[in-house]
Design a protein with these regions (language model features):
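N-terminal basic/disordered segments at the start of proteins
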Residues: 3-24
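Hydrophobic faces of well-ordered beta-strands that scaffold small-molecule active sites
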Residues: 4-7, 25-27, 60-64, 91-93, ...
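Catalytic cores of alpha/beta
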Residues: 13, 122-127
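Active-site-adjacent beta->alpha loops and helix N-cap segments on the catalytic face
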Residues: 37-47, 96-105
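Alpha-helix-loop-beta-strand connector modules within alpha/beta enzyme cores
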Residues: 43-61, 105-108
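Conserved small/polar residues in nucleotide/adenosyl-binding loops
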Residues: 134-143
Length: 145
């Protein structure tokens, strides 16, 4: 299934994407995103963004696309929990350890392979299927792996 996916760094961009036909929005929160110094939504704003997107029949994904250290995994749980409860549609993940962690603690949460994961062949794509990935997002990869 093809999906028009748009980035959003703030509520204004998110609303513009929804109002201009995006099927889904992706954004970073206050932690674990590759664009740590970019403008990102607060926890409260992100929960409101989830609600707004769902009211308009769209999906919303959050990036967890940094490499995590062992000590950060408990932080990841506390970080994702409010968004999971609010109905976040999925996470875009880079770190394979985070994949295992999210799969164990948030088993219903769809995971998308971040472009930083650099999956460029069918062996990599097949492996991701075995660890609960539902989407592969790599700029370099054609749709017909």
């Amino acid at each position: 299934m093809k999906e028009l996916l748009s980035p959003a760094g703030n509520m204004e961009c998110l609303k513009a994407a929804v109002n201009n036909g995006a099927d889904a929005i992706y954004l970073g929160g206050s932690a674990f995103g590759a664009r740590a110094y970019a403008q990102n939504l607060s926890e409260e704003d992100l929960v409101q963004a989830i609600e707004y997107v769902h009211i308009h029949g769209r999906k919303i994904y959050m990036t967890v696309n940094t490499l995590l250290k062992d000590r950060e995994l408990n932080e990841l749980y506390a970080y994702l929990l409010p968004y999971y409860k609010a109905g976040l549609d999925g996470v875009i993940v880079q770190d394979i350890g985070a994949v295992k962690f999210i799969g164990e603690y948030f088993p219903e949460m769809p995971m998308h392979a971040s472009t930083q994961m650099t999956i460029t062949n069918t062996l990599g794509a097949d492996f991701l299927k075995t660890v609960s990935y539902t989407h592969l997002r790599a700029h370099e990869t054609k749709a017909n792996l």
